[in-house]
Amino acid sequence: MSEPWRDSNNVVKAWKRCLGFFVQRRPPGFCERVPSGALTKPLAFNWSFGALLSAFAACQNIPSLRDEMAEDLPFLRKVHESYFDSRHQAFRSTPLRWKGDIYFDDNAWIALAALDIFRMSGQNLWIDDAMKIYRFILKEGYDPGSGGVYWRMHPKSSLHVCSAGPTALLGAKLMQLGESVPQDPIDKMIEWCWQMRDSRGVFRDHYNLITRRIDSSVYTYNTGTPLHAVMVMAEILPKEAYDNMAQDVLASAPALLPGHSLPATPWFNAVLLRALEKASRRYSQEMLSPLLDPYRRDMSQSWKRFESTDQPLVLPSSERKPGILLRDAASSVETLALLHQIAS
């Protein structure tokens, strides 16, 4: 099996091709899908743009690529600002020239990417954005009674692991950086997520406040962020409980990979891999290999296709519409960068 992730030059090559494939200079932004369909807005939803920011951060985290990656940051910043709604101090789902909604989960993903960019660039405007988003979610999206976080601003009809998990992780990372954030909401969000685990130990999707039922759908990213959050908390407050929670989730995580294969959801899988990269610095390879091997296998196959075409790197995706989604391509680049970090 080839191991393209071992060479950092492959990582930057994949990043540059992804960037060039989706970029739009006027107005500045990135396409949601290439080629665009008749009913597709030309510019990406912030979910997909957030995936691109996360891919940038993962690539920039590789020391040998830092200077070269920095060349792309000013343009990314310009696009980033086009989603910002100053009235709410949060990011809308589309650039402000179009009517868009505010989703709490998408804001948390953008804030997490912003924090990672801050760590590498030292530019305070990125951590300032992360703090604005965290305060906004605690004020408008966090339910202190349950510890859950709503999915979207309107209607507030469901509490989602995909909102509570990344928000808990965001709070933990801000605390780790020395920001003044209270611990209680972080712990409550983690506890709420833990109530959403099924009998196998993986995390179910959301609780519907209208029907009072739990949606039992399982996605890899919903296990990734609670796992990541407790590992960060274990570094801040070395309590045995946090470490035990992390190891318990890792022991349950193979249930996400039926037949030892990843689901065809590249972005969801990249979120889980962020947590596994963190775990690779804490726990044994013996524990993690069954989880990491499917990523390596899929990447090896996808890299062969990448090298034989002029298309972006794209891992197996269940997307059935024509063209390539930005978030699928961006998360494939992020996966390559994370595998490089794990191997280093």
Language-model-detected regions and their locations in the chain:
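Extended ligand-binding groove/face enriched in aromatic
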Residues: 70-177, 184-187
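Inter-helical turn/loop segments and adjacent helix faces that build the functional surface
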Residues: 62-63, 120-124, 174-184, 233-240, ...
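Active-site cradle of extracellular carbohydrate-active enzymes
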Residues: 164-167, 171, 182-230
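Oxyanion-binding "anion nests"
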Residues: 218-256
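CBM-like carbohydrate-recognition segments
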Residues: 3-105, 159, 241-248, 252-344
